[in-house]
From Swiss-Prot:
EC annotation from Swiss-Prot or TrEMBL: 3.6.1.7
One Gene Ontology MF term: acylphosphatase activity
Entry superkingdom: Bacteria
The protein, known as: Acylphosphatase
Hydrolase in keyword set: yes
Active site: R24, N42
Reaction catalysis annotation: an acyl phosphate + H2O = a carboxylate + phosphate + H(+)
Domain (Acylphosphatase-like) ranges: 9-95
Organism: Saccharopolyspora erythraea (strain ATCC 11635 / DSM 40517 / JCM 4748 / NBRC 13426 / NCIMB 8594 / NRRL 2338)
One family name in Pfam for this protein: Acylphosphatase
Length: 95
């Protein structure tokens, strides 16, 4: 059983050639496989912001996937920020 203390919110900013290559769709698929809720949003400057909430271990696995060589496009750098989950998220959306 996952307690509230084991829940986390990951915000990751993915830099590189990650727009127009299916990166957000790929991220959504990985997040849903891991049981996470959140979003993947295109930002200016060839960045995608990924927000995911759920079990910390699942968020860590998503972060590993974002940094892996298996992503669509070409990831140069992933910056991360961890915080307490805010809740209210359902599903995983592409924006």
């Amino acid at each position: 059983m996952v307690t509230d203390a084991q829940q986390a919110r990951l915000t990751a900013w993915v830099h590189g050639r990650v727009q127009g290559v299916g990166f957000r769709w790929w991220t959504r698929a990985r997040a849903l496989e891991l049981g996470l809720a959140g979003s993947a949003t295109n930002l200016p400057g060839n960045r995608v912001e990924v927000v995911a909430e759920g079990p910390r271990e699942s968020c860590e696995r998503l972060l590993e996937a974002l940094r892996s060589p298996d992503t669509p496009g070409d990831v140069d750098h992933v910056a991360e920020q961890w915080s307490e989950p805010k809740g209210g998220l359902t599903g995983f959306v592409e924006r």
